[in-house]
Amino acid sequence: MSGGREIALLGGSFNPPHVAHLMAAWWALATQGVSEVWLLPTFRHPFGKDLAPFEDRLEMCRLAARALRGVHVCGAEAELAADPLVGKTARTLEHLAAKHPDHRFALIVGADILAETAKWYRWDRVQALARVIVVGRQGHPPVPGAPDLPAISSTEIRARLARGEDVRGLVPEKVLRYVEEKGLYRG
């Protein structure tokens, strides 16, 4: 895993992707010495949450990624759909390391995730396969050298959409248009 370009992975449900995701990607590109950021939507949520169809979330990530040079989308978890460990970050990292032996990987996580790593499958393996980059989250202890991202959540965005409320400014414009055209997250 030495040498090569370092790719930062920003994983999540992206249900839907929002501007704080793009802020995290931009910050990693600008300050963490990574060549690219790959948005990595989970195929199936590891803790069983209901999600919009994978293809819709993948397309919303593609639309969001267009806003920033150096941000791309990785659908690797779909390649692992039949794997019983799909959605487990350690398994996804193993798959990507085998598929892209010329790359090094970093994993962008929010400060809120650090308190939950005991619940993760093989967090030790995740740390062995990727440099962990932590971004701050409002309402959590500060991370030295990292900005606190705004407290924007996909859960709140879905709730607002279900109530028919405006979410402009919280999600990229092209993502919002896609959500409206597809009728996603309506109550």
From Swiss-Prot:
UniProt pathway annotation: Cofactor biosynthesis; NAD(+) biosynthesis; deamido-NAD(+) from nicotinate D-ribonucleotide: step 1/1
Keywords: ATP-binding, NAD, Nucleotide-binding, Nucleotidyltransferase, Pyridine nucleotide biosynthesis, Transferase
SUPFAM superfamilies the record matches: Nucleotidylyl transferase
Catalytic activity: nicotinate beta-D-ribonucleotide + ATP + H(+) = deamido-NAD(+) + diphosphate
InterPro entries per UniProt: Cyt_trans-like (IPR004821), NadD/NMNAT (IPR005248), Rossmann-like_a/b/a_fold (IPR014729)
GO molecular function ontology, one term from the record: ATP binding
Name of one Pfam family that matches: CTP_transf_like
EC assignment: 2.7.7.18
GO BP terms, alphabetized: NAD biosynthetic process
EC main group: transferase
Amino-acid biosynthesis is among the record's keywords: no
Free-text function comment from the UniProt entry: Catalyzes the reversible adenylation of nicotinate mononucleotide (NaMN) to nicotinic acid adenine dinucleotide (NaAD).
Family per similarity comment: Belongs to the NadD family.
Record NCBIfam families: nicotinate (nicotinamide) nucleotide adenylyltransferase (TIGR00482)
HAMAP family: NaMN_adenylyltr (MF_00244)
Name of the featured protein: Probable nicotinate-nucleotide adenylyltransferase
Species per Swiss-Prot/TrEMBL record: Anaeromyxobacter sp. (strain K)
